[in-house]
Design a protein with these regions (language model features):
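Core beta-strand elements of the Rossmann-like FAD/NAD(P) dinucleotide-binding domain
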Residues: 3-5, 244-252, 256
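Residue-level detector of alpha-helix initiation sites
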Residues: 14, 18, 153, 259-260, ...
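Mid-to-C-terminal "cap/lid" subdomains and adjacent gly/pro-rich loops that border
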Residues: 216, 252, 273-406, 414-417, ...
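N-terminal glycine-rich phosphate/pyrophosphate-binding loop and immediately adjacent elements
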Residues: 2-127, 279, 285-291, 296-305
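Conserved redox-cofactor binding core of oxidoreductases
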Residues: 112-230, 234-238, 301-305, 313, ...
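Internal hydrophobic alpha-helix adjacent to the cofactor/substrate pocket in enzyme cavities
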Residues: 166, 281, 460-463, 549-560
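A glycine-rich dinucleotide-binding beta-alpha-beta segment and adjacent secondary-structure elements
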Residues: 50, 66-67, 187-194, 198, ...
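Glycine-/small-residue-rich beta->alpha transition segments that form the dinucleotide
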Residues: 13-14, 36-39, 251-252, 256-263, ...
Length: 560
């Protein structure tokens, strides 16, 4: 591609890869896809640890495929935030969790962004993007899309105990978390696929799904190793991007760099809160609330030990099952009556704002991919102390020793899926190479603390059911004295706090972009990633990120 592209897409991740691939289906549109990291071709082009869906080794701080941002979950709790720096973005690094946003999420976003984002409007997009190995072509699922989706078997010792424990507490079964059933316990849909010629199933990222089949198109260029520094804007119009390799002209620029990098690019380009930009000497192009109120899912890992060997090395996913439930309709008192049939039905009546995710691999294995006793993996970690920070949900420096001590623990990961609190992303320099400041402000709201307490206590109640009686041997970090006292439990939660790294809403539809992702006050500039969601969905956002790329591509193609 020698002449300027019609569209430059910045970021080849969960949304950017689908967007670029769909735009290039129109032969007359020249599309340039830029990625700061490498852009490997085919399954064999990716490092083995990034294909393995049983680990999250690529999310380890210091891995070349990871940006390793530094954030603060609370003012005194620093965390490393894993974000993908490779083709496929974070779909290449994450736990392969591929659960759709709930219909109520889409409908709530539509109240802000317009009816084109309602569940009914988005369902054709959700069906088009997937090949669902379990449900196939149906009114809710697709059978010919680029993203392969399956649900792990629930026959392993841990998965069977988890679902039985949830049933014992009265929670309903939820066999299809991408369907319309009541929230409950069930298998987690995952983007895992065994491609032809492969002996093992792999983490099926958006690069493999969307870009590989499109590489031969003469109107699509995929360029890796190019870091975009800022958007070039002249007289209120985006005309290209400045990169580490020089300026690149474009008819239109679409930022798909993710909910951290995208707001940073806007801010250093003069799009953001006027006072903040002026304080850094940045000329203001558009006074917009960029980065001022993002949301994410605070989470905590509840460590426990087993009575006997329960880890199945044949299990090809790390997180096969989850329980989703509502805090509003499940009181702590009900947890003391584990056999009460009234526990589940009311809790399923509302959209679930709490999640408990089952991890079936020990923490050490998740981080290192080392099997058996994990001693070799721990030695590897100790040789690289900066990489001991927890990859899955980040870790503070003060948690480093705890993570090493409990490397063989199993975990239930509890998360608050609809937090009241909001975080902020700011820049401290006009230099685009200076990382942004990411302040989560987690658990500042009592409503968030009370719901997280309920999630923690529910997770412990699951482990103490009859279903886990011949498996569970005890908690490894949480004591009954803390569990039974709100103030003590709050202190424990703050000391063990993590994040699901599901950041959304830093460039929201409504206040910063319109319903088609167009930035207010700047022509020729769009955003298409999870930063445009008004707030985080009540499930993980990976599947929604892909849908955003598909949806904005629809809008752009319809407009010519």
């Amino acid at each position: 591609m020698t002449s300027p592209a019609d569209v430059v897409v910045v970021g080849a991740g969960g949304a950017g890869a689908p967007l670029a691939a769909r735009l290039s289906e129109d032969p007359g549109r020249r599309v340039l896809l830029l990625e700061a990291g490498p852009t490997p071709a085919g399954v064999r082009g990716f490092p083995a640890e990034l294909l393995d869906p049983t680990t999250v080794q690529g999310a380890m701080p210091g891995h070349p495929a990871n940006w390793s941002y530094l954030g603060h979950l609370t003012p005194d709790l620093p965390y490393m935030i894993a974000r993908g720096r490779i083709l496929g973005g974070s779909t290449t690094l994450n736990g392969a969790y591929f659960v759709r946003a709930r219909p109520a999420d889409f409908d709530a976003w539509a109240e802000v962004a317009g009816p084109e984002w309602s569940y009914d409007a988005m369902l054709p997009v959700l069906r088009r993007l997937e090949t669902d190995r379990d449900y196939g072509d149906s009114d809710r699922h697709g059978s010919s899309g680029p993203m392969f989706v399956m649900r792990p078997p629930q026959a392993s010792i841990l998965a069977a105990a988890f679902t039985a424990a949830a049933r014992e507490l009265g929670f309903p079964a939820e066999p299809d978390k991408n369907g319309l059933g009541d929230p409950g316990a069930g298998p987690v849909p995952v983007n895992v696929h065994r491609p032809p010629g492969s002996h093992e199933a792999v983490r099926w990222n958006t690069g493999l799904a969307y870009i590989d089949p499109a590489r031969a198109r003469p109107n699509l260029e995929v360029r890796g190793g190019v870091r975009v520094l800022r958007v070039l804007i002249r007289e209120g119009r985006a005309v290209g991007v400045e990169t580490t390799a020089g300026p690149i002209e474009a008819g239109e620029v679409v930022l798909c760099a993710g909910a951290i990098a995208t707001p940073q690019l806007l801010l250093v380009s003069g799009i953001g809160p006027r006072a903040d930009l002026r304080a850094l000497g940045i000329d203001v192009v558009a006074d917009l609330p960029v980065g001022v109120a993002f949301s994410d899912h605070p989470d905590i890992a509840i460590g426990w030990r087993a009575q006997r060997p329960v880890v199945d090395s044949r299990e090809r996913v790390a997180f096969p099952a989850a329980l989703n439930f509502s805090s509003e309709l499940l009181s702590p008192e009900r947890l003391s009556s584990v056999h009460s049939p009234s526990v589940g039905s009311p809790a399923a009546a509302a959209e679930a704002d709490l999640e408990i995710l089952l991890a079936v691999k020990p923490l050490g294995y998740l981080l290192t991919g080392t099997a058996h006793t994990l001693a070799g993996g721990v030695r590897t970690v100790l040789r690289h102390p900066l990489r001991t920070l927890r990859a899955l949900i980040g870790v503070s420096a003060r948690r480093m020793a705890q993570q090493l001590t409990h490397r063989d623990d199993l975990q239930l990961i509890v998360a608050l899926q609809q937090p009241a609190g909001r975080g902020r992303i700011t820049i401290t320099s006009a230099d685009p190479l200076v990382p942004p400041q990411i302040d989560y402000r987690y658990l500042e709201e009592e409503a968030d603390r009370s719901r997280m307490r309920l999630a923690v206590r529910t997770a412990v109640a699951l482990l103490r059911t009859a279903a886990f009686a011949d498996v569970f041997d005890g908690l490894t970090e949480l004591r009954d004295a803390e569990l039974g006292d709100d103030a003590a439990l709050d202190a424990w939660m703050l000391a063990h706090l993590g994040t699901a790294i599901h950041l959304c809403g830093s460039v929201p539809m409504g206040s910063v972009v319109d319903s088609h992702g167009r930035v207010h006050g700047v022509s020729g500039l769009r955003v298409a990633d999870t930063s445009i969601l008004p707030w985080a969905p009540s499930r993980g956002p990976a599947a929604t990120a892909v849908a955003i790329g598909e949806r904005v591509a629809d809008f752009m193609r319809a407009q010519g």
